[in-house]
Amino acid sequence: MLVPLKLVRDQPLQRQMFEQFASLIHSGRLTAGARMPSTRMVAGQFGVSRITVLLVYDRLIAEGCLETIPAKGTFVSQAPVPRPGTAMGRPAQAPSDGSAPPCGGGIGETRLGRPDPTLFPLARWRALLRNSVVRLGTTAGTDHGTGAVRLRHSIAGWLATSRGLAVSPDQVILVSGRQQALHLVSHLLLPRGGRAVLEDPCDPSVARTYAEGGADLLYVRVDERGIRPEALPDGPAALLYVTPEHQRPSGALLSAERRAALLDWAGRSGAMVVEDDYDGEIRYGGIEAAPLMSLDGGERVLHIGCFATALGPWVTLGYIIVPISMAQAARNCKRLLDDSVEAVESAALAEFLESGAYARHVHRLHKIYSRRRDALLGALRRHFGPVTTWGTSAGLHLAWHFPKTLGAAVTLAEQARHCGLEAEATGGADAQALLLGFGTLSEAGLECGIDRLAAHTSVQTGSAMRAV
């Protein structure tokens, strides 16, 4: 199958491929259920790196345009395709009904942790983009190497203020989203394979990325205080991947004692710690643990961050903070993957950060999402009494460890989705948990959803008791 893309060499290839594939899906030229060509075939057809195609497919999968069926391949999603009009870095009109962003799926699709698209500061962002185009003039287009110098300074300043991280702009490597960050880390730390230690449970895209890098994967179980240091393996390891602020997916917050223990283990094993701060912008007060990178002194930790939780998928830029000793190697690796950053978007984001508008936007989000989280917790307590939850200190989803009398987690998650909630099942041999998202629903919508779920489970429980 030949793919009808028209690529030019003076624009970022990854961006072009994403936009053109999305357009083919929007227009119906790639029909629902159609099998996509392999990444190797596409890379060969256009003479590009297979990593570039993998990143494009990953982005299309993340946004619901494509879906992967194990042992069969990658296919155009069966979900309804929304109107065209959104490209990377250019927001479409945020829908007023709180529906999913472009390429979003249909009923029953969860995608936990989605931000509310109606909260995106659309007018402000469009003004920033227009101003950036005017200022850049004929230089607008792409920026090379580690990205726009101004944005790297802006991110370093923002991290110092918001996360207490003292880093040099030279340590900031700009990437086109979290997935490219994961691929860059894989190339940087796993050039010849090696042992990669991951959390259990773990985001499947992380495991897939490191497996593709040739890593020998080892999983370490997570409990309510995060990954368990005593279960970390003896002997050498290449990397340890953790999500300490809001474990993905369980929501667990890594305790201060365990943070110190992880760094001690990393020193003994020779591993680099990859700290994914994917939900770091949305925190709800209380005692805040210091980022691993600040505790480490900057030698054994790489810190991944992005703006997607606060700004949604329309602003794709992210970053990796690397130890200063690795900065040159990281820049070289970035050039091999994709030696460009969209100049207009990076200039707009730098202005957003420097003006204080981004900080005000994040503060507003904290208040709105905090009320939604409280509404969800209040509804759970009202119907189910004292509840055990993880992940209430950050992010846009929490884990409810529900009573076994409510049945299987998978069944309860399906019931919750039918009640209008954003839900997924998780858990293991020792626990049952339901992951509940609260980013895209109003307070009233969350309360109504839990009311309906409680009524449904009450009827089921009563029927089961009568049957006995």
Which residues are covered by each model-predicted region?
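Conserved core of the PLP fold type I
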Residues: L129, V134-S269, E281-I282, I287-G298, ...
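Short glycine-rich anion-binding loops that position phosphate/pyrophosphate groups of nucleotides
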Residues: P115, P244-R248, T309, L441
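Hydrophobic beta-strand scaffold residues
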Residues: L217, V273, E422-A423
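N-terminal basic, amphipathic alpha-helical segments
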Residues: M1-N131, G137, R331, R335-E342, ...
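Helix-loop "lid/cap" segments that line or gate small-molecule binding pockets
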Residues: I155, Y319, A347-S355
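Active-site PLP attachment segment
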Residues: A71, D296-A329, V341-V344
